[in-house]
From Swiss-Prot:
The gene is rplM. InterPro entries: Ribosomal_uL13, Ribosomal_uL13_bac-type, Ribosomal_uL13_CS, Ribosomal_uL13_sf. One of its GO terms (molecular function) is mRNA binding. It comes from Prochlorococcus marinus (strain MIT 9313). GO terms for cellular component: cytosolic large ribosomal subunit. This is Large ribosomal subunit protein uL13. Part of the 50S ribosomal subunit.
Length: 150
């Protein structure tokens, strides 16, 4: 009888990855990053444990969307007060807080429970090419080389 091995928390090795979002499509980048955060790229993947790695996303202000989504895609938030709904287009949010677009896309692809919140803490998103995590020596993660050449 084969037994399924569950990795102990001490045996999980976490790496740091650097993703350049310049000229990447939002959804395609988000699925790959969510998979790495979750740990699905490792043979020790366990659905109920945090086996994933840290991911640093840079150049969030240069991410793109296909079609006319820049003008049509809406981001909504609510203050909790009556009449407190705020609606903003992709382009307006891109100008104001481009990090939030990437964070929201990736967060929606993580589990919607305590594990997902723990995984989301390992995501670091920055507007420009600089980030304060150079001491961790992140490895460059190639997502889709064909998309970046367009």
């Amino acid at each position: 009888m084969n037994k399924t091995s569950v990795p102990s928390i001490d045996s999980i090795e976490r790496q740091w990855f650097l993703v350049d979002a310049e000229n990447q499509t939002l959804g395609r980048l988000a699925t790959e990053v969510a998979s790495v955060l979750r740990g699905k790229n490792k043979p020790s993947f366990t659905p109920h444990l945090d086996t994933g790695d840290f991911v640093v996303v840079v150049n969030a202000d240069k991410i793109r969307v296909s079609g006319n989504k820049a003008n049509q895609k809406l981001y909504r938030r609510h203050s909790g007060r009556p009449g407190g709904m705020k609606v903003e287009t992709f382009q307006a949010l891109q100008d104001r807080l481009p990090e939030r677009i990437v964070e929201k896309a990736i967060k929606g692809m993580l589990p919607h429970n305590a594990l997902g919140r723990q995984l989301f803490r390992k995501l670091k998103v920055y507007r420009g090419p600089e980030h304060p995590h150079s001491a961790q020596r992140p490895q460059t993660l190639q997502l889709n080389p064909a998309a970046s050449s367009q």
